[in-house]
Each structure stands twice: as structure tokens, then as C-alpha cells.
Amino acid sequence: MFYHIKELQYQAKPAHPDPVYAKKLQEVLGGQFGEISVMMQYLFQGFNCRADAKYKDLLYDVGTEEIGHVEMLATMISRLLDNAPADVQEDAYKSNPAIAAVMSGMNPQHAIVSGLGAMASDSEGYPWNAKYIISSGNLLADFRANLNAEAQGRLQVTRLYAMTDDPGVRDMLSFLIARDTYHQNMWYAAIKELEERERDIVVPTTFPRELEKQEVSYDLFNFSRGDESSQGRWAHGEAFDGRGEFRYIPAPIAFASAPHLKPAPMWLHNTVPPMSKC
């Protein structure tokens, strides 16, 4: 179960209202790599975890912290919308707040739909989507997805930090940036621990290697003009799983012939291929 404490994990007080920035901040709340996404991703990985108790507990720890980050951002967005839209529009638009909201760059749904509150959507008003989250049951795969989510999230928050000079907003964002720093390090540590325990880096580690076409397991195919990619570490030397040698293939060949499909049944009304001449 969850137990709510009314105090925020960290303060979320802007120095002044800014409905346009509130729209931008929606991205790290309800966007693909926003706090709702990582909250749901970690919690569902925790709900579904069948591995060690320490990993399940870690997922619950971080997932529950992310609930607090959702709360902080929702609070900040609501406060940025205080006195909006009328008090922040030019005199020419004050007689029509809806028009003023659109003309100023504010998200009109913040006034019409949520009543000056945050929404579970991104900066363009697109609703949060459960397809954003990954919970596969394979912790090595999932933790790598978590590391990417934290990296993308931190990147977006740092960009938002540069888009405002409000000291209160920057203060809260600096806290979130710091937490993302820890979370990236944390997931990296968990990934390395699992790699060492499973003695492999290729997911899934439990699939028998003899069942894959090992002749191409470590080949880089040059499928674009130029050969600059041959200069990378991924093109030569021992592979990082320790089970093969990287090879650069400058002129890849086809391993199969051109495919020819049978005509579809007539009742599907597909285009019929031309009849061959006798």
C-alpha cells in the first residue's frame, strides 16, 4: 500500500506566474521521458519482479520517490498558472481570456480543462501513454531502459533549466537534476552487478548461443556509403561479451534470394498479378 505524506519532497515555489513556461514544464511531467513515465515504469517493474528481494525493494524505493516528483511538478505547474490567463496578457486581449491564452503561447487546456492545474500530458497536450513504459520481467533489459529514461529525462530538465530565469523554478529543477544524477549512477551499478552475476552482457543471457546464427554474431555490415564506422571500437578487437571478435564487412552480401509472394485469396480483393503468357 502507499501512505501519503502531505509535505513535498522538495519545495516547488516559482518567484512569479508564467503560464507559457507551465506549458513547457508539462513535458517532463507527462511526456515520454517525464516523471509519470518513470514512476509507472519502476512501479510496474517492481510489481512484476520475480527476482531478488533487493531489486524489488529498489524498484519500489525509486518508483515511490518518482510519485513525489510527479507531485512536485504538478504543484509547480499549478503555481505557475496562478492569476492566469488574464493577469499575464497584454491589454488588447484582456477582454477575452481564451483568446489571450492562445495568443500568448499558454496551453488553453490549462484554463479550459484543468482549471489552472497540471495535466497528465506533454507540452503539446498529448495525453500520457502507457506505451511509454517498459516492464519485461528481464531486469538487465529493464535496468538498461531505466538508465536511458533517466538520461533522457535529465537532458530535458537541463534544457528547461536554461529556458527560465525564475530562481524558484531553477531551484526545484536543480534538485530533480541531482536526483537524476544519482539514479543514472544507481541503474548503472545495478546493470554492472547483473552483468557480473550472469557473466554476460547480451540479453537474454539464458538463450543458448548455439541456437543463433553465430557466423554473423559480431559483424558490422557497411550498409551506407563511406567507411568511417570501421574506425570504431565496435568494428575490431574482442567483443565485450568475451565470446567473439568484431569484424567489419565492407561489402555485405545477400544471404537469400529475392522473395516472391503467392497471390492473395480472391475474396480479399488484392491487386492481382499479371497472368503469365504461355
Swiss-Prot record:
Organism lineage string: Bacteria, Bacillati, Bacillota, Bacilli, Bacillales
Family note: Belongs to the manganese catalase family.
Protein name: Uncharacterized protein YjqC
Record Pfam families: Mn_catalase
Database matches in InterPro entries: Ferritin-like, Ferritin-like_SF, Mn_catalase, Mn_catalase_C, Mn_catalase_dom
Gene3D superfamilies associated with the record: 1.20.1260.10, manganese catalase, domain 2, chain A
Top-level taxon: Bacteria
Signal peptide location: none
